[in-house]
């Protein structure tokens, strides 16, 4: 009763072997970190975040089109090159040579201060611009256009001196051409005609009679 039979002993010895065979047949998961890194790199490639090398930079630079090629391409498409050289300035009239003696080169543009030296002309302008008529623009409109305040206009009207003369004195640095523009603006063709005649006829005589003004 206490002794095991051969069959019973065989069963006892086969149990461990059967368990060992079962363990060998089961797949064992590979946990080697080196192998895992290679497998992951195949599925998910790692991006290179390093700066490009000098050779790569040179290659990129060489592959870029030159400025001349880009300019020619823009011209072929019919569009001007906006990044090119700035447009040249409008050519001026070079018909007059150096030391030219024509009237347009010798004469400077007269100012109102030059006009104030001609008493006869001042009298004519004063007679035309001093009177106050409801439908005619006079010195008040001229002075207001050039920035004179309402209080100043009223003050000049109260003075015994001609308000037109005061207006011209305060704007003596302006040109006679600017004064003629005011005449055209307010439809005072009569005053503009007087000024135009003085600029074309009297002013050249006065300017040429004093050569020291050119130096």
Swiss-Prot record:
Biased composition (Basic and acidic residues): 17-28
Tissue: Detected in adult pancreas, placenta and fetal skin, and at lower levels in lung, thymus, prostate and testis.
UniProt domain Death: residue ranges: 123-202
Single GO biological process annotation from the record: signal transduction
Key word Cytoplasm present: yes
Keywords in alphabetical order: Cytoplasm, Developmental protein, Differentiation, Disease variant, Ectodermal dysplasia
Coiled-coil regions listed in the entry: none
Ranges for region Disordered: 1-41, 62-86
Disease: Ectodermal dysplasia 11A, hypohidrotic/hair/nail type, autosomal dominant: A form of ectodermal dysplasia, a heterogeneous group of disorders due to abnormal development of two or more ectodermal structures. It is an autosomal dominant condition characterized by hypotrichosis, abnormal or missing teeth, and hypohidrosis due to the absence of sweat glands.
Quaternary structure, from the entry: Self-associates and binds EDAR, TRAF1, TRAF2 and TRAF3.
Function: Adapter protein that interacts with EDAR DEATH domain and couples the receptor to EDA signaling pathway during morphogenesis of ectodermal organs. Mediates the activation of NF-kappa-B.
Protein name: Ectodysplasin-A receptor-associated adapter protein
UniProt source species: Homo sapiens (Human)
Gene field: EDARADD
